[in-house]
From Swiss-Prot:
Segments for region (Disordered): 16-159, 190-210, 234-311, 647-707, 855-948
Tissue: Polar granules at the posterior pole of the oocyte, and by the time the egg is laid, at the anterior pole.
Keyword annotations: Cytoplasm, Developmental protein, Phosphoprotein, Repeat, RNA-binding
Compositional bias per record (Basic residues), positions renumbered to this chain: 16-29
Species this chain originates from: Drosophila melanogaster
Modification Phosphothreonine occurs at: T650, T655
CDD domains the record matches: DSRM_STAU_rpt1, DSRM_STAU_rpt2, DSRM_STAU_rpt3, DSRM_STAU_rpt4, DSRM_STAU_rpt5
Domain remark in the UniProt entry: Contains a proline-rich domain. The insertion of this domain in the DRBM 2 domain is required for stau-oskar mRNA localization.
Protein's name according to its UniProt entry: Maternal effect protein staufen
Biased composition (Basic and acidic residues): 267-284
Effect the entry attributes to changing I586A: Crucial for the structure of DRBM 3
One of the record's GO molecular function terms: mRNA binding
GO process annotations (BP): anterior/posterior axis specification, embryo; anterograde dendritic transport of messenger ribonucleoprotein complex; asymmetric protein localization involved in cell fate determination; bicoid mRNA localization; germ cell development; intracellular mRNA localization; long-term memory; neuroblast fate determination
Length: 1026
């Protein structure tokens, strides 16, 4: 390090006569030096005089830096015994240092002063430009950047010789060297906003940028309070000087200790001064300054309030973070009533403290932060470069390539650039031959790669016989070297190995002159999807931007049209069906399965491309898109075109729909046949009965359809239980169509009693029902002989219709026309008994059947009377009475009618199931309703019913002895109910359980026995004695 840093001293430095007249040869001592050395000999004994402003000054302080460096080299060549005196004299001469701390006698050493004169003459003669200029206004401070507007624009240090460059670019903490103060007053009196400092022939406008330039390179780690302007500097003895380095060392503490604080403060305060606002207490001028000399170091260019969207508290946070200090808000006081309080908040910003009042704590915090920002002595952070608002006019920084990538991704197209091989630069550009790039500086031969054009930073200025860089620091500074320096290779590979020269004239290089090479334009090909664009530019990047701009013009129109089409499609979708729905509908009409399948996915993860296949029967189409839904839609659109080529549909394809519609007329036909069967019997009420059946059948059919009472699966299971065989087994045979098909077909097979039937349907449930219906019809056709017209009509009817037809069947059974099925209990007809849930319908059926079958029931009642008469003659002592016999006749008639009614209505399912609890529950309500019907249809009084009740119980006991089964009555107390309950159990096969209800236990037993007799008559056991 060969820098010679000297600090400014608060003493006048007047060189007006010397620099303007240049007539100092007649003086023994240099006039400029006499003004300095005279007071310097007396400065150690007396305090310095107050600073005075000279009338005018030349601009000698801002000399060329190259000559100053030459002067320093001459000073280093002096002998060691003269080093101390020369250093002190040089310091006094160059910096106005009254306080030179030299231990030697300066006035007696004429040789040293002669050398100083020679150096000064050399400086004056070499700076002839300065002597001819008229005196300008008094300079404020030396500004090494004033004559270098380029460096000011880039906020960099002035250029130095090459061997000094590393020292200046390394650290920001140390102040820049060679800051020469040309006046006695310190830098804190300067105001850069006044345009009063003309710097060595430079424009005044450049001086305004000096604070920014130095501000970027000089940082203060802590707050500096400037001491008073005039201070008494005590001499410090200088240690022995042994080498030349001790004299010229810029950081030597032994020679500048007494003046070091002022040096640091002047150099650090100089860039931090700003133009204060015009107020009474903040105004600072040359003659008015506070006692401590402290000034706010806020820079107007970095004002914290420049950001519109940042609150004062946010700016304080940035200020504290920038200066590496802590800040804290404290609520120090609350005063005033509860509804209108005033809060005092104190902000501790490092060592500073600010307080503010507000009606809200947050408001007081912001006020304290605003006060701190305005009055703080800490350095403000540099303003951040704010990006333009979204959608603003400054959104031009987006390059065409970036915009093209976004648009192509939106359209689902891939982009890639294809470079011509002749445009590719050489790969081995790290170390050119002989470190000079000889093959790049000479013109390449035919077929060789052409050198790319230079970047913006590679422009150079022509000066003398060599090339010198422009003042701005280049991106790759190691590429630039002076005429006398040897070039060295770069440490890291860069984009351009060596910038090619510009211009058509011959250039001078380190290996001799070489002609300029014309640079051909770069050419690149851009592919966007299946489209091709060619871009041309001076550089490869410009060619890419040109190609991207051409592609954008085409793709933007495509994107607009695509968005319009999508909008129209979305509007039309509300009116018509999508292509996918249309394909499914056509598949259902033509009985063809429709299936969509994603075949493959292509492209990167952020821009997938899907290929989906649409399969309808044997026709396959493919669709492509950036989403599965889009590709599926496009495949469906292609499929619609293919399906339109098929021949038109034939009407035979809709037969399954016709078969479904045929079911309803079948029920009405069965009802019609039922009406003909019922009306076939003669009776007085034949004329009115068909009209009543027509009136009651339609609502009954609707109820059955709603409640699904005629489920063939249930009917088949009940039939198997009645026949004491295994339940039917259902099995799915085939399934036509996949999960995505709108209409599928299932084939179900059911097997029971060695018979098998199949059914088809669009669902498994429907196929199962169809199969059960087919098997049920098959099993009933096997049981019943085809000669029985009544039974054949019953097979085609529903359960409700069948229950209405069973009364004639029982009559035929009484006459012996229906073959009996052999059971352990006795013969029983082969009919299926189903449970009826519609009680009102039962009542109507019972009434109709009773009126139409009066004669047949009377014949059956006579047979029952004979059985009852035999029982009464054997067991009753009072059976001879005519009244008893008449009552027995009436009761027997009632019992016969009840048995016929029960046979017709099918009031109990106990003959099918052995579950006693279900039987009790089912027979409870039915028997209660039937008991009312019996009362209505009978002409006997209640007393006759009660007296005949004994006969009902005894008749059941007598019948049990004849058929060899046991009867067990179980009585339950009244409890909370109004009636008594009796349960009768019959040990028949299967066992039967019935219950009865009455106001007394006797009545309940008779009711239970009556219900048991009804069940036995229903099973045909009452005919066993014949």
């Amino acid at each position: 390090m060969q820098h010679n840093v000297h600090a400014a001293r608060p003493a006048p430095h007047i060189r007006a006569a010397h620099h303007h007249s240049h007539s100092h040869a007649h003086m023994h001592l240099h006039p400029g030096m006499e003004q300095h050395l005279g007071p310097s000999l007396q400065q150690q004994q007396q305090p310095p005089p107050p600073p005075q402003q000279p009338p005018h000054r030349d601009l000698h302080a801002r000399l060329n830096h190259h000559h100053l460096h030459a002067q320093q080299q001459q000073q280093q060549q002096t002998s060691s015994n003269q080093a101390g005196a020369v250093a002190a004299a040089g310091a006094a001469y160059h910096h106005g240092n009254i306080n030179s701390n030299s231990g030697s006698n300066i006035s007696s050493n004429s040789n040293q002063m002669q050398k100083i004169r020679q150096q000064h003459q050399h400086l004056s003669s070499s700076n002839g430009l300065l002597g001819n200029q008229p005196p300008g206004p008094p300079p404020q401070a030396f500004n090494p950047l004033a004559g270098n507007p380029a460096a000011l624009a880039y906020n960099q240090l002035p250029p130095h010789p090459p061997h000094h460059m590393a020292a200046h670019l390394g650290s920001y903490a140390a102040p820049p060297p060679h800051y020469y103060m040309s006046q006695a007053k310190p830098a804190k009196y300067n105001h850069y906003g006044s345009n009063a400092n003309s710097n060595s022939g430079s424009n005044n406008s450049n001086s305004n940028y000096a604070p920014k330039a130095i501000l970027q390179n000089t940082y203060r780690n802590q707050k500096v309070v400037v001491p008073p302007v005039v201070q008494e500097v005590t001499p410090v003895p200088e240690p022995p000087v042994t080498t030349n380095n001790a004299t010229t060392n810029s950081t030597s503490n032994s020679t500048v200790i007494a003046s070091e604080p002022v040096t640091q403060e002047d150099t650090s305060q100089k860039p931090e001064t700003r133009q204060e606002p015009a107020s009474a207490d903040d105004h600072v001028s040359t003659g008015n300054i506070d006692a401590t000399g402290a000034l706010s170091n806020e820079d107007t260019s970095s004002s914290g309030r420049g950001g519109k969207d940042k609150t004062p508290m946010c700016l304080v946070n940035e200020l504290a973070r920038y200066n590496k200090i802590t800040h804290q808000y404290r609520l120090t006081e609350e005063r005033g009533p509860a509804h209108c309080k005033t809060f005092t908040v104190t902000l501790m910003l490092g060592d500073e403290e600010y307080s503010a009042d507000g009606f809200k704590i947050k408001k007081a915090q912001h006020l304290a932060a605003s006060k701190a920002i305005e009055e703080t002595m800490y350095k403000h952070p540099p303003p951040k470069i704010r990006r333009s608002e979204e959608g603003g006019p400054m959104r031009t920084h987006i390059t065409p390539t970036v915009e093209l990538n976004a648009l192509a991704m939106k359209l689902g197209q891939r982009t890639f650039y294809l470079l011509d091989p002749t445009q590719i630069p050489p790969t081995d550009s790290i170390v050119p031959p002989e470190f000079a790039g000889g093959h790049l500086l000479t013109a390449p031969g035919p077929g060789m790669p052409q050198p790319p054009p230079p970047p913006a930073y590679a422009l150079r200025q022509r000066l003398g016989n060599g090339f010198v860089p422009i003042p701005s620091q280049p991106m790759h500074p190691h590429f630039f070297h002076g005429p006398g320096q040897r070039p060295f290779p770069p440490k890291f590979p860069s984009r351009f190995a060596l910038p090619p020269p510009l211009g058509a004239h011959v250039h001078h290089g380190p290996n001799g002159p070489f002609p300029s090479v014309p640079t051909p334009p770069s050419k690149i090909t851009l592919f966007v999807g299946k489209q091709k664009f060619v871009g041309i530019g001076r550089t490869l990047q410009q060619a890419k931007h040109d190609a991207a701009a051409r592609a954008l013009q085409v793709l933007k129109t495509q994107a607009i049209s695509a968005s319009e089409e999508a909008l129209e499609d979305s509007m039309d979708e509300g009116d018509k069906k999508s292509p996918i729905s249309q394909v499914h509908e056509i598949g259902i009409k033509r009985n063809m399965t429709v299936h969509f399948k994603v075949l493959r996915e292509e492209g990167p993860a952020h821009m997938k491309n899907f290929i989906t296949a649409c399969i309808v029967g044997s026709i396959v189409t493919e669709g492509e898109g950036n989403g599965k839904k889009v590709s599926k839609k496009r495949a469906a659109e292609k499929m619609l075109v293919e399906l339109q080529k098929l021949p038109p549909l034939t009407p035979t394809k809709q037969t399954p729909l016709k078969r479904i519609k045929v079911k309803t007329p079948g029920k009405s036909g069965a009802a019609a046949r039922e009406g003909s069967v019922v009306s076939g019997t003669d009776g007085p009420t034949q004329t009115g009965k068909p009209e009543r059946r027509k009136r009651l059948n339609p609502p009954k059919d609707k109820l059955i359809d709603m409640d699904d009472a005629d489920n063939p699966i249930t009917k088949l299971i009940q039939l198997q239980q009645t026949r004491k065989e295994k339940e039917p087994i259902f099995e799915l045979i085939a399934k036509n169509g996949n999960e995505t098909a709108r209409r599928r077909e299932f084939v179900m097979e059911v097997s029971a009693s060695g018979s098998t039937a199949r059914g088809t349907g669009n669902s498994k449930k429907l196929a199962k029902r169809n199969a059960a219906q087919a098997l049920f019809e098959l099993l009933e056709a096997v049981q019943v002989t085809p000669t029985n017209e009544t039974q054949s009509s019953e097979e085609c009817s529903t359960s409700a219709t069948m229950s209405a037809v069973t009364a004639p069947a029982v009559e035929a059974t009484a006459e012996g026309k229906v073959p009996m099925v052999a059971t352990p209990v006795g013969p029983m007809p082969g009919i299926l008994i189903l449970r009826q849930n519609k009680k009102p319908a039962k009542k109507r059926d019972q009434i109709v059947i009773v009126k139409s079958n009066v004669e047949s029931k009377e014949e059956e009642a006579n047979k029952e009377v004979a059985v009852a008469a035999e029982e009464n003659s054997n067991n009753s002592a009072n059976s001879g009475d005519s009244s008893n016999s008449s009552s027995g006749d009436s009761q027997a008639t009632e019992a016969a009618s009840e048995s016929a009614l029960n046979t017709s209505t099918g009031s109990n399912t106990s003959g099918v199931s052995s579950n006693s609890s279900n039987v009790g529950a089912n027979t409870d309500g039915n028997n209660h309703a039937e008991s009312k019907n019996n009362t209505e249809s009978s002409s006997n009084s209640t007393s006759n019913t009660q007296s005949a009740g004994v006969h009902m119980k005894e008749q059941l006991l007598y019948l049990s002895k004849l058929l060899d089964f046991e009867v067990n009555f179980s009585d339950y107390p009244k409890g909370n109910h109004n009636e008594f309950l009796t349960i009768v159990t019959l040990s028949t096969h299967p066992p039967q359980i019935c219950h009865g209800v009455g106001k007394s236990s006797e009545e309940s037993q008779n009711d239970a026995a009556s219900n048991a007799l009804k069940i036995l008559s229903k099973l045909g056991l009452n005919n066993a004695m014949k």
